């Protein structure tokens, strides 16, 4: 046996001798809390996110949008000045959603998730890139956006944000 092992054994023996006769304390000051059901919270959160992403968009609803000129929309309570600022690119989008190659269902889900994300993180302007392609998403995206209560206005994006293939979206963020 090495010198190191004997020192270790001596230390262990001294400790054992020092704590001989000690009784285990009964824990009486801290009350154990039952474990929280994190699975249930996760299910509620995912259900809420799913309802955020798909609740507002209907393919049957057709809002009144201008047929002439660039694609644009504003709620009744939004001034035309805000739409003009969107058109000019004064608002710089903080979030970009690229819907190229998505199906209509995927695009709806992602659009709803993007709006929910923007509202949660207090982001006022986002860019939705629907592309030009076969014009399916280009026609549907404005119809879906006009249905959402958090969308104040949208306008065809300036060239630096996608031009004909994108929309700048102005969102209302509820005060907390």
Curated annotation (Swiss-Prot):
InterPro entries: Smr_dom, Smr_dom_sf, SmrB-like. It comes from the Bacteria. One of its GO terms (molecular function) is RNA endonuclease activity. Residues 97-172 form the Smr domain. Residues 29-51 are annotated as: Disordered. Associates with collided ribosomes, but not with correctly translating polysomes. PANTHER family: DNA ENDONUCLEASE SMRA-RELATED, UPF0115 PROTEIN YFCN. Acts as a ribosome collision sensor. Detects stalled/collided disomes (pairs of ribosomes where the leading ribosome is stalled and a second ribosome has collided with it) and endonucleolytically cleaves mRNA at the 5' boundary of the stalled ribosome. Stalled/collided disomes form a new interface (primarily via the 30S subunits) that binds SmrB. Cleaved mRNA becomes available for tmRNA ligation, leading to ribosomal subunit dissociation and rescue of stalled ribosomes. HAMAP family: SmrB. This is Ribosome rescue factor SmrB. The lineage of its organism: Bacteria, Pseudomonadati, Pseudomonadota, Gammaproteobacteria, Vibrionales.
């Amino acid at each position: 046996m090495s010198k190191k092992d004997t020192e270790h054994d001596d230390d262990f023996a001294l400790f054992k001798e020092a704590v001989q006769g000690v009784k285990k304390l009964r824990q009486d000051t801290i009350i154990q809390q039952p474990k929280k059901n994190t699975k249930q919270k996760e299910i509620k959160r995912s259900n809420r996110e799913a309802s955020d992403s798909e609740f507002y968009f209907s393919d049957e609803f057709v809002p009144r949008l201008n047929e002439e000129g660039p694609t644009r929309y504003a709620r009744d309570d939004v001034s035309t000045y805000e739409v003009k600022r969107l058109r000019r690119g004064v608002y710089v989008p903080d979030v970009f959603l690229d819907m190229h190659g998505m199906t209509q269902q995927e695009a709806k889900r992602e659009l709803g998730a993007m709006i929910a994300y923007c509202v949660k993180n207090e982001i006022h302007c986002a860019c939705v890139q629907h592309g030009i392609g076969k014009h399916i998403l280009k026609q549907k995206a404005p119809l879906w956006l006009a249905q959402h209560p958090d969308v104040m206005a949208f306008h065809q994006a300036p060239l630096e944000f996608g031009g004909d293939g994108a929309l700048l979206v102005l969102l209302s963020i509820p005060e907390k």
